[in-house]
């Protein structure tokens, strides 16, 4: 397998962490959407990351679809329950974080990709509100002990921990550590795991 994209992307990183957690061998090509679009299009014509090339040459895109496929190919995996309410719960917790991450990337791109006079502050304010709502929901869940982290981490733990690390690093004015202490603690438990250590952000 070949995983395409930089670990600076939380979506690429969560796929990498899942692969390492499962012990699935793969090659990582840290291609950037900023500088390597032509190469990325060889794996995904839409030029989005992550992309995953399977050993049979099939190309997969979008982190949720990639992870679902990986788990389906891994008998006995424990990251995501097979059926029922427990499965829905894990997927919903992932969805909350991924929704916040989608808005965070829009927030980061808005001032970078527009001339200063065309950046609309109400848009940024609305995105910040949505990111905060995502984190507030997850902090409340974490306070109830929903996320275990550590050696017992499931897909939601991985996704939330990866997402918090990205948000706190990239948008510390929104992902304020003192406001989300349980997410900070979850991240700390997870970042020491070998699978997380193997997917360090590029410089």
Would you name each region that the model predicts?
Residues 1-122:
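GST-like domain detector, emphasizing the conserved glutathione-binding G-site
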Residues 9, 157, 193:
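Conserved G/P- and acidic residue-centered "switch" motifs that form tight phosphate/ATP-binding loops
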Residues 67, 71, 91-94, 135, ...:
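Non-transmembrane alpha-helical segments in soluble domains
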Residues 97-188:
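GST-like fold's C-terminal all-alpha helical module
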Residues 131-132, 191-203:
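Charged/polar, low-hydrophobicity segments characteristic of intrinsically disordered regions
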């Amino acid at each position: 397998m070949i995983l395409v994209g930089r670990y600076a992307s939380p979506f690429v990183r969560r796929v990498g962490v899942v692969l390492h957690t499962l012990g699935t061998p793969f090659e990582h090509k840290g291609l950037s959407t900023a500088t390597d679009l032509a190469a990325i299009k060889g794996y995904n014509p839409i030029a989005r990351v992550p992309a995953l090339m399977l050993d049979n040459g099939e190309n997969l895109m979008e982190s949720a679809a990639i992870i679902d496929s990986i788990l389906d190919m891994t008998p006995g995996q424990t990251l995501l329950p097979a059926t029922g309410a427990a499965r829905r719960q894990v997927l919903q917790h992932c969805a909350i974080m991924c929704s916040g991450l989608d808005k965070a990337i829009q927030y980061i791109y808005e001032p970078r990709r527009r001339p200063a006079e065309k950046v609309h502050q109400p848009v940024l304010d609305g995105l910040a509100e949505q990111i905060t709502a995502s984190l507030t929901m997850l902090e409340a869940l974490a306070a109830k002990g929903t996320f275990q982290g550590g050696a017992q981490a499931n897909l939601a733990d991985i996704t939330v921990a990866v997402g918090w690390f990205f948000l706190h690093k990239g948008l510390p004015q929104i992902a304020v550590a003192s406001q989300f202490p349980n997410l900070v603690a979850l991240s700390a438990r997870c970042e020491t795991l070998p699978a997380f250590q193997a997917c360090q952000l590029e410089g």
